Amino acid sequence: MIMKRVVIAGTSSEVGKTVISTGIMKALSKKYNVQGYKVGPDYIDPTYHTIATGNKSRNLDSFFMNKEQIKYLFQKHSKDKDISVIEGVRGLYEGISAIDDIGSTASVAKALDSPIILLVNAKSLTRSAIAIIKGFMSFDNVKIKGVIFNFVRSENHIKKLKDAMSYYLPDIEIIGFIPRNEDFKVEGRHLGLVPTPENLKEIESKIVLWGELVEKYLDLDKIVEIADEDFEEVDDVFLWEVNENYKKIAVAYDKAFNFYYWDNFEALKENKAKIEFFSPLKDSEVPDADILYIGGGYPELFKEELSRNKEMIESIKEFDGYIYGECGGLMYITKSIDNVPMVGLLNCSAVMTKHVQGLSYVKAEFLEDCLIGRKGLKFKGHEFHYSKLVNIKEERFAYKIERGRGIINNLDGIFNGKVLAGYLHNHAVANPYFASSMVNFGE
């Protein structure tokens, strides 16, 4: 069947993938029902896609998922859409290893048999830009069908690039040329872009502008034409365990906590969980629930506000269900962040550092039954944080880290029977026990 799809891949990081991919999604959304995707484990870029398309963007990751799972997850979310735009990660071929493509944009493109549009930084380049494209085309068996030249300087620069392409690569479509433009910049910080909940109105306005600029400089009809290819469907691929058990889950979601995979919520709902969102910043108490789920984010930027909300802190302390905290959520339920008092459910504190403390795909094994898995089972995830825990008096950890760092001594997931919290970020496919364990733990 036809399932229109295209990967927007870069020759490297910092070539404009997120801005241009999001702009393409926004521009196409005027005529089409668009599904966005991000290659890799990033939380923030998909929230930009979601604003652009009105559909929840998803992650596709060949470390988290095998080829069939990538195809099935894509099929699940794209089957009722007109076209899918998949934003790559880093350079097209960058993955976790120097000698294979696991974790790379190329691996996802190959799993989906998707055409690729290559985004090239053309600053001060003409013939050399063509050499780069030819190298990318010959390196592996991927389908590079078009190119976008970013950071072009002048009409003369554009003419030279056109001449070089027509001479050396006449069969590759030129999708367009984007000039050096301050409007194509996006604000970032240590964990990536600024999350959309922090400055929603301004980011929405930027995305509208990116869509207008893409319409001006790129050939959208060529993008749709390139995307128009057959897709080989797959049937009944295992994504995650389903062991239905009705539970109410309160999920922290606001400016401080917004790092979530929407597929985790899908997996929880398939296991009959009912999800209700609340704000540790603005609300006075946790909703009526069986489980409290506090995901990642930037609590360090809002630590004073979080600390001032004494009613919420007391509500969390008095919560009589199970609590799961992930990275930023872990930090929040320690005694303090940079000496600013927090919830204090865990006997340790969090401090921010100037250097990354964990940046890795993770392989782990459960040491005991807990809120997100069962003893002896292995799972995957990722970690990315600049904080670390100090004055750790906790001695019980739910999982050992086989690849990655964890909290201390290759251990992660502080666990006291009621509270589980760690630095490892879970995706429901990479940890297929996540949702079923959460709704069934303790029974």
UniProtKB/Swiss-Prot annotation:
One of its GO terms (biological process) is cobalamin biosynthetic process. The keyword Ligase applies. It catalyses: cob(II)yrinate + 2 L-glutamine + 2 ATP + 2 H2O = cob(II)yrinate a,c diamide + 2 L-glutamate + 2 ADP + 2 phosphate + 2 H(+); Ni-sirohydrochlorin + 2 L-glutamine + 2 ATP + 2 H2O = Ni-sirohydrochlorin a,c-diamide + 2 L-glutamate + 2 ADP + 2 phosphate + 2 H(+). The keyword Transport does not apply. Transmembrane segments: none annotated. Keywords: ATP-binding, Cobalamin biosynthesis, Glutamine amidotransferase, Ligase, Magnesium, Methanogenesis, Nucleotide-binding. Its cofactor is Mg(2+). Pathway: Cofactor biosynthesis; adenosylcobalamin biosynthesis; cob(II)yrinate a,c-diamide from sirohydrochlorin (anaerobic route): step 10/10. InterPro entries: CbiA/CobB_synth (IPR004484), Class_I_gatase-like (IPR029062), CobQ/CobB/MinD/ParA_Nub-bd_dom (IPR002586), GATase_3 (IPR011698), P-loop_NTPase (IPR027417). The record marks 425 as: Increases nucleophilicity of active site Cys. Pfam families: CbiA, GATase_3. Its EC number is 6.3.5.11, 6.3.5.12. GO terms for molecular function: ATP binding; cobyrinic acid a,c-diamide synthase activity. The active site is at residue 327. Residues 248-433 form the GATase cobBQ-type domain. Gene3D superfamilies: P-loop containing nucleotide triphosphate hydrolases. Belongs to the CobB/CbiA family. Comprises of two domains. The C-terminal domain contains the binding site for glutamine and catalyzes the hydrolysis of this substrate to glutamate and ammonia. The N-terminal domain is anticipated to bind ATP, and cobyrinate or Ni-sirohydrochlorin, and catalyzes the ultimate synthesis of the diamide product. The ammonia produced via the glutaminase domain is probably translocated to the adjacent domain via a molecular tunnel, where it reacts with an activated intermediate. Catalyzes the ATP-dependent amidation of the two carboxylate groups at positions a and c of cobyrinate, using either L-glutamine or ammonia as the nitrogen source. Involved in the biosynthesis of the unique nickel-containing tetrapyrrole coenzyme F430, the prosthetic group of methyl-coenzyme M reductase (MCR), which plays a key role in methanogenesis and anaerobic methane oxidation. Catalyzes the ATP-dependent amidation of the two carboxylate groups at positions a and c of Ni-sirohydrochlorin, using L-glutamine or ammonia as the nitrogen source. The a and c carboxylates of cobyrinate and Ni-sirohydrochlorin are activated for nucleophilic attack via formation of a phosphorylated intermediate by ATP. CbiA catalyzes first the amidation of the c-carboxylate, and then that of the a-carboxylate. HAMAP family: CobB_CbiA (MF_00027). This is Cobyrinate a,c-diamide synthase. It comes from Methanocaldococcus jannaschii (strain ATCC 43067 / DSM 2661 / JAL-1 / JCM 10045 / NBRC 100440) (Methanococcus jannaschii). The lineage of its organism: Archaea, Methanobacteriati, Methanobacteriota, Methanomada group, Methanococci. The gene is cbiA.
